[in-house]
């Protein structure tokens, strides 16, 4: 599901709220989450999961076209850990 599809679905379920209002709310939430992570903070949504940053250590990679070695710097990447309730809801193959 894309962000646009999410906005459409939410707006369709909430007929008393305009699509523009839903779009603004979704964008505001995502912007605030990005800012919070950029500040090094963790985000926890009970029953859904948590977002945090994980550090990727520097390493040697390879250019896929040439095969040359490339030094990759260490960096922080966003990480999502689903909560138990979400894991249980999506575990339909038991």
UniProtKB/Swiss-Prot annotation:
GO BP terms: namely: DNA recombination; regulation of DNA-templated transcription; regulation of translation
Q: Which UniProt keywords apply?
A: DNA recombination, DNA-binding, Transcription, Transcription regulation, Translation regulation
> Which InterPro entries would you find in this protein's record?
Hist_DNA-bd, Histone-like_DNA-bd_CS, IHF-like_DNA-bd_dom_sf, IHF_beta
Source species, domain of life: Bacteria
Identify the stretch annotated as signal peptide in this record: none
Any one GO molecular function term: DNA binding
GO cellular component entries: chromosome; cytosol
Q: Name one Pfam family in it.
A: Bac_DNA_binding
Supply the HAMAP family for this chain: IHF_beta
Give the family this protein belongs to, as stated in its UniProt record: Belongs to the bacterial histone-like protein family.
Q: Quote the subunit structure annotation.
A: Heterodimer of an alpha and a beta chain.
Q: What does this protein do?
A: This protein is one of the two subunits of integration host factor, a specific DNA-binding protein that functions in genetic recombination as well as in transcriptional and translational control.
Q: What is this protein called?
A: Integration host factor subunit beta
């Amino acid at each position: 599901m894309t962000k646009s599809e999410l906005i459409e679905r939410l707006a369709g379920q909430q007929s008393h709220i305009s699509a523009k209002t839903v779009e603004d709310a979704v964008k505001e939430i995502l912007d605030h989450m990005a800012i919070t992570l950029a500040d090094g903070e963790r985000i926890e949504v009970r029953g859904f999961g948590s977002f945090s940053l994980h550090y990727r250590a520097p390493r040697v990679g390879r250019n896929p076209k040439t095969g040359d070695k490339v030094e990759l710097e260490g960096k922080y990447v966003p990480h999502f850990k689903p909560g138990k309730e979400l894991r249980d809801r999506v575990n339909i193959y038991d």
